[in-house]
Amino acid sequence: MEVYQNAALSPEERAKDLLGKMTLQEKVGQLNQRLYGFRIYEREDEEFTLTEEFKEEVNRMGGLGALYGLYRADPWADKDEKTGIVLELSAKAYNMVQKYVIEHSRLGIPMMMSTECPHGHQALGGGLLPVNLAAGATFDPELLLEGYRACGKQLKSGHVELALMSALDVARDPRWGRSEECYSEDPCLAAAMAKAAVTGMQSTGVGSVAKHFCAQGETTGGVNASAARIGERELREIHFPPAKACCEAG
């Protein structure tokens, strides 16, 4: 047994040994999360097959660092109950994908999994919460914390390590089509709710990636991903509080 495979040793010892054995290409491969998980498989009845795109990517990089959105199913992903991964087939699909990654990694390194959690688990059979704007209207951070704790447990059961959570945006223009992903137009309330969401999720051992960027809610003309025409003071007073709260939550 190699040192990095010995579960009795500390994570630091195992990681140091593993890094010492990896090539530069393999290290780069561990930073790779280019693939959309919902595009790496085809489903027919209850059977799954991996796409050539997925196999080529794993083989090219000598492994795969992380896979985004394996369970995602919505019109954007073009997956539904007939073509996507329903809850009762999720373990089967995950095991197939992870097995391929491990067997085609020289050092047997498993991949991480990340998934969208804009308001609960964005998957077939996933538990959903009210959209953020509705959650913010409750003025109840503790209730939201419990909701994301339940969500985190579901993600954990699906072997998801990273939850991509809408938590940083402050609603500044109702014309913006993603305003429902904001907890509030008030930075104090938005910060309290964001901190609760991250705390609830991470209490289950699932890491939180708070999205999207500071001041994304400060759109120009309500256009998504447009420039934020603000000064430093507004950035600090309005848009930094949710980000700071998420950092304080760990």
Kindly label every feature range from the protein language model.
Residues 1-250:
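Glycoside hydrolase catalytic-domain context in secreted enzymes
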